Amino acid sequence: MLEELWSPVAALTAAHRGRANGLITSTAVTADLLPESPRIAVVLARASWTHELALASGAFAVHLLAADPVEVSLAIFRTLGFRSGRTEEKLAEIAWHPGVTGAPLLDDALGYVEARIAGTLEGDGVTVLIGDVAAGARLREGRHFTIEDVRAHLTREDWAMWEARRAEELEQARRARAVRIAE
């Protein structure tokens, strides 16, 4: 059941000291009721390079991808979701520019929110970042990319790559839990 709780498919980006990276997150939600002080909450894998960059810089950007053209969002999904930024520059293949926080803003996104980290909640394998919204915009009209779009368009090879990355993240989370329990 928990796998059905995906929010819209979102890309999360961060940069620090000339290095930029991004990932696909399953959770990005509003985190405050007050419109005069908007906040966003996102979940990202603790083992990811993007996690390190976001914490080091104190900022991140979340992007909604567009359902149309689906090929553009699938390319972003594959690049940010299937590869490791520790071994390659994932954003080299994606058009972007720096935002007001320094976080990369994806040019082909439907829209984005930039935030400065206000707090964190650590899990064994993930961190929840709470961010004070610094900027944001809808770049164009259209429907956002959903997990249903992903399921409808990924190939068997894509799913195998996704599952392999997921297995790595699960193993890292299990090791972190074992260390925490041992302490």
Per-region residue spans from a language model:
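Basic, polyanion-binding surface patches
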Residues: 1-183
